[in-house]
Amino acid sequence: VKSIQRNALSAAVALAALGAAPVHAADFTIGLSNGWIGSEWRSQMIDEATAAAEAWKEQGVDVEVVVQSNNVDVPGQIAHVRNFINEGVDAIIINPNSPTAFDPVFAQAKDAGILVIATDAEVSSPDAIYVGIDQKGWAEASARWLAETLGGEGKVVAINGVAGHPANQMRVAGYQEVFGEYPGIEIVNEVNANWDQAQGQQAMQNLLATYPDLDGVWVQDGMAVGAWKSIMDESKTGDIAATGEIRKDFIDLWVENELNSGASVNPPGVMASALNVAVPLLQGRELLEPAEAGQYGNALYLDIPFIDGDNVESVAGDMDGEPGYHSYSSSMTIDQAGALFQPE
């Protein structure tokens, strides 16, 4: 990405032209947009980003966040962005409901002098950068674990998230590509369960009834708990290998039952990482390496941790005392994010 340096005067003029009242009480005001609240992961994402702003205050940089988080369609989330523009925020960090629909409104934000960062799902806009994991790589890692665990052959089903969501689309592409490298792996069915545990459990129950000789299951996020419960109900834990997830209730289930599972980690801390990249950009600092990765050439990818039988007990220990819905998480600290930039 080209050097992002703010021009306070031009931003103020642009905001005045929009009839907005710029927000300047804090050093930086950052709008956080989340367009889907169907999982605790999203709530934790917002909480961790808010905590990241507080950490900046402890270092003498007053970062305030304005949160818009509710169930909205794409036009509703575009309205989030327009609201932030009118409020005169310095940056917008968004978990977008579409990869392409935000291009015009992101251009408006740029014209208003506002930095835009997408997280968790990539966007096509040349006026935004993406800070988060490679969702395709996330799926590839767990699919490769499953394929290798099965010895490169077997009947596999996939239980996916929300059809059409950009992160889900990239994940589907990821596992399909990896399984395509193994001629002995047969994907016998692919279904959607909308990242919902109950729907995942029902989907798995139906799939087991249809395919009693199933060998493997590739399943995403919170749906994994439901899928594994159906596998356990059918007493097939010794016959089936399946991907897992990162919530404490599943990690505990995994350890207690010695499940044959592996899980790529998409930490809810991705929005906190994006915020810790946003602040140096707002301060006028330049990235050591431009954000040019990904299908749109605007991504800065974070590392993807992986949990399997070798480290799951350690992860369980790290999560001791957390509620069952809490997700195993990580994020770049202020110092780690700062290391991505040219020295001051």
Language-model features, listed with the residues they occupy:
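Sec/Tat signal peptide C-region and signal peptidase I cleavage site
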Residues: 20-25
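Extracytoplasmic "Venus flytrap"
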Residues: 29-52, 56, 66-79, 89, ...
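Short, solvent-exposed amphipathic alpha-helices that sit
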Residues: 41-57, 138-142, 166-185, 203, ...
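Short beta-strand elements in bilobed, periplasmic/extracellular small-molecule ligand-binding domains
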Residues: 55-70, 156-158, 176-197
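Hydrophobic alpha-helical
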Residues: 82, 90-109, 175, 193-253
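Flexible loop/hinge segments that line or gate small-molecule binding clefts
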Residues: 99-137, 141, 148, 155, ...
